[in-house]
A protein has these predicted regions:
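A short, conserved beta-to-alpha structural element at the edge of catalytic cores
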Residues: 120-129
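N-terminal capping/lid subdomain adjacent to the active-site entrance of alpha/beta enzymes
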Residues: 1-119, 135, 143
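Catalytic alpha/beta core domains of metabolic enzymes, predominantly
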Residues: 131-180
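Residue-level "edge-of-site" marker
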Residues: 25, 65, 98, 128-130, ...
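A structural motif
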Residues: 57, 122, 168-169
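Hydrophobic alpha-helical scaffolding
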Residues: 1, 72, 103, 127, ...
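Conserved beta-strand positions in the central sheet of alpha/beta enzyme cores
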Residues: 59-61, 126, 173
């Protein structure tokens, strides 16, 4: 992937064109950048969120850390705390980090977590399950009140096909450094 990205960069520089033009051009005029940070102990996370809010960020993704790894009270404390710090006027997404080799979250946990996240107006719930758990992602998407995202760790187009065909996600997130 690194070589592929570098070659496209060189091609864009040689032609004097943004490489997006070679892939069909601009789809929108603006994108929403978001600050991404670990769900650390609330005091530390809140300090980081406050600093990032002060830098002008209006969208945030909090993830990994202890979320889904201790208990549901801890999960809600983290999300409630983040929402309080950034306010209701900011976008908030949550990444459970289900691609972690030691991830224990299951479908029941993910459904319950998604309902809790809806209470805090979370924009999407990312990696709520292990990355290859197609059947559970399909069921989670059916039951979740918040959009479900994933596919970040998949590396080949064939890996994406069943998730797309079965509509397992509301948001597909390929990582260009992994898929080439």
């Amino acid at each position: 992937s690194g070589i592929d990205i570098a070659l496209w960069d060189i091609f864009g520089k040689i032609t004097g064109q943004p490489i997006g033009r070679f892939f069909g051009g601009r789809l929108r005029e603006k994108v929403m950048p978001y600050a991404s940070l670990l769900m650390d102990e609330p005091k530390i996370m809140n300090a980081n969120l406050t600093e990032l809010r002060g830098q002008g960020f209006k969208a945030f993704k909090i993830g990994w850390g202890t979320f889904g790894r201790i208990d549901t009270a801890n999960d809600e404390l983290l999300v409630k705390s983040a929402r309080k710090v950034i306010g209701d006027d900011c976008f908030l997404a949550v990444d459970a980090g289900g691609s972690d080799a030691y991830w224990r979250g299951n479908l029941r946990w993910a459904i319950n977590a998604s309902k809790m996240l809806a209470d805090y107006n979370v924009g999407w719930f990312e990696e709520a399950l292990r990355p290859d758990d197609l059947a559970d992602f399909i069921e989670l998407r059916k039951q979740s009140p918040v959009p479900i995202s994933g596919c970040e760790v998949l590396t080949r187009r064939q890996s994406f096909t069943p998730f797309i065909a079965e509509r397992a996600f509301d948001i597909i997130q390929p990582d260009v450094t992994k898929v080439g």
